[in-house]
A protein has these predicted regions:
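Active-site bordering "gate/hinge" segments
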Residues: 1-247
């Protein structure tokens, strides 16, 4: 099977690979598994990218960008199963990965419950759950939001004396999965978050707590001020805590 040339999808998604490319990767893997003699096989191609920024005590601490890709293959030989994965999308790498999964399956003990679902249990429709809302966030914007969150926590009460930092993360991913009994499907999703961990009190009486907001859509995140204040209130509530008597 000829593998299509990956083309960059629209800038709206930010992904490096389009779904048709993933479909072809998966179909290539499944076809090779059957060629080797597999009873059944499943494969999933995925890609993710994102940005994470952390600050502490009013200073930028870390900026991390990630972009990952993977093809995972599961091969069944009777009731025996083998798994292998690769981040190399070349045809040769795909065939090596399938071969590795097949070899593992051949020498693995049988599992009476291993196998793919029956036809009547396979999903044939995929509702749109509105899970994908990419966030075109720059590192400067992320740092500004994190600093605002930490500042809000520190300004809540004079008893908030320190901070373990605040962070902002924007993550996007998509995948396509299929197996030899007919299932085909996949979707894109996003997960964005904002968090902070303030410290209340001094010396041996210091207490730490944290709070966060995590949403599919960045517009639905709680404000930096709200997250910071609530995290501070949680830390303050721990001051002068004592053990409850068992009696």
């Amino acid at each position: 099977m000829k593998i299509i040339t990956p083309r960059v999808p629209s800038a709206e998604t930010g992904f490096s690979y389009a779904r048709p490319f993933f479909e072809d990767l998966v179909d290539t893997a499944l076809a090779h598994a059957k060629k080797l003699g597999a009873t059944d096989a499943g494969a999933e191609a995925s890609e993710g990218y994102g940005l994470s920024v952390s600050v502490r005590k009013g200073e930028l601490e870390n900026v991390e960008r990630n972009r990952d890709k993977s093809l995972g293959v599961t091969v069944y030989v009777g009731q025996r199963r083998g798994n292998a994965s690769t981040s190399d999308f070349s045809r040769a790498a795909i065939e090596r990965t399938v071969q590795a999964a097949y070899d593992i399956a051949r020498f693995t003990a049988e599992d009476p419950v291993a196998g793919l679902p029956d036809a009547e249990d396979i999903a044939t429709t995929q509702p749109d759950l509105d899970l994908f809302h990419p966030w075109a966030l720059t590192s400067e914007q992320a740092a500004k939001i994190a600093l605002e969150c930490e500042a809000a926590a520190l300004a809540t009460d004079r008893r908030i004396t320190n901070s373990e930092g605040a962070g902002v993360s924007a993550q996007q991913s998509h995948f396509f999965s299929a197996h030899t009994r007919g299932f085909r499907g996949g979707y894109a999703s996003s997960r964005h978050s904002l968090s902070v961990a303030p410290i209340a009190g001094k010396g041996a009486g210091m207490q730490r707590d944290a709070w966060y907001s995590s949403m599919r859509c960045a517009e639905e995140l709680a404000s930096p001020e709200a997250v910071g204040r609530y995290a501070a209130e949680r830390a303050l509530s721990r001051l002068k805590s004592r053990k409850i008597s068992p009696r």
